A protein has these predicted regions:
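Conserved core beta-strand positions within WD40 beta-propeller blades
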Residues: 2, 37, 70-71, 109-111, ...
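Conserved beta-strand positions in repeat-built beta-propeller and related beta-rich domains
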Residues: 5-9, 40-45, 73-77, 112-117, ...
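Structural motif
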Residues: 10-13, 46-49, 79-83, 118-122, ...
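A short beta-strand motif characteristic of beta-propeller blades
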Residues: 17-23, 52-57, 88-95, 129-134, ...
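Eukaryotic tandem repeat interaction scaffolds
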Residues: 138-146, 150-218, 222
Length: 286
């Protein structure tokens, strides 16, 4: 199991030990694992790096996603979703909400959090044709998909921030609120056992299947922006607090600091040696 992290130190990888992966992007902010490849973005300087190529990104890119060997970007400045081919040439662009800031890919569909337009938008791939839009409470900002069921974080009140965690079935349109939580929307992901991990405000929460009460509730975070779950490991990137952490989820244990410093996107990828990192070893930043 290998971990990728976009950081102020560049693109970092952990697979038994830390190493820096040479790239021309000095300060990457977003990444996406595309099979054995990693797409890397510097959203501040509007640069994309993949397979040895540097391309220009639209302004305001908030999300980078892979679909097959192609790439998706979502911009909160242009309010557009864009699909790129295997050589990073833009194929098609579609309007998607107002200040959109979250999306998820499910088979041949991409779900976009329309944010200020109050809708979850469903687009078909590869033509990016909008096939449905579901009005939801508040401003939907984060979404994760588990088959045909979406799990979403929506901001209800920016003045005294409250976030609604809910589920939505794509086939029936059924809406099911899970919890109303204090704080800003951070991140949400679905574990292999179909349970929910969510970062809201200064908290990390876990909701068992079909439960509206969290069985894990950890505090002390800044604002978790990226979550990635694989097997019994949860990878956490908290840019506000300036660290990346990893925790065991079965049973849940206290998160271990994996990296200290300015950080952005993170994800798991297959480790070439097929070995798990020794998390009891020294976890100093590289």
């Amino acid at each position: 199991m290998e971990v990728y992290l976009a950081s102020a130190a560049g693109l970092l990888s952990w697979c038994g030990k830390w190493r820096k992966i040479p790239t021309p992007l000095a300060h990457p902010t977003l990444l996406a694992a595309c099979g054995t490849d990693v797409a890397l973005a510097d959203s501040v300087n509007r640069l994309l790096y993949r397979q040895g190529r540097i391309s220009t990104l639209p302004p305001g890119v908030k999300v980078l996603r892979c679909w097959r060997n192609q790439l998706l970007t979502l911009s909160s400045e242009t309010n557009c979703l864009t699909l790129y081919d295997a050589h990073d040439y833009p194929l098609v662009t579609s309007p998607a909400g107002i200040r959109p800031c979250g999306c998820a890919v499910v088979d041949c569909q991409v779900i976009v959090c329309g944010c200020e337009d109050g809708c979850l938008h469903i687009f078909s791939l590869p033509d990016l044709r909008e096939i449905a839009a579901y009005p939801v409470p508040g401003c939907p900002m984060r979404v994760a998909a588990d088959g045909g069921v979406l799990t979403c974080l929506s901001l209800l009140s920016p003045d005294s921030p409250q976030t609604l965690l809910f589920r939505l079935c794509l086939t029936s349109g059924d809406f099911a609120p899970v919890a109303l939580l204090p704080g800003w929307c951070g991140a949400v992901t679905i574990a292999d056992d179909h349970t929910i991990w969510a970062g809201v405000g200064e908290q990390l929460l876990h909701f068992p299947l079909d439960s509206v009460v969290p069985d894990v509730q950890l505090g002390g975070f800044g604002l978790i922006r990226f979550l990635s779950c694989q097997q019994s490991k949860l990878l956490i990137s908290d840019p506000w607090a300036g660290h990346c952490l990893l925790m065991d989820t079965t049973p849940p244990s206290a998160p271990r600091q994996l990296y200290a410093g300015e950080c952005g996107g993170c994800c798991f990828a297959s480790c070439r040696k097929g070995t798990l990192p020794d998390w009891k070893a020294s976890l100093n930043e590289p």
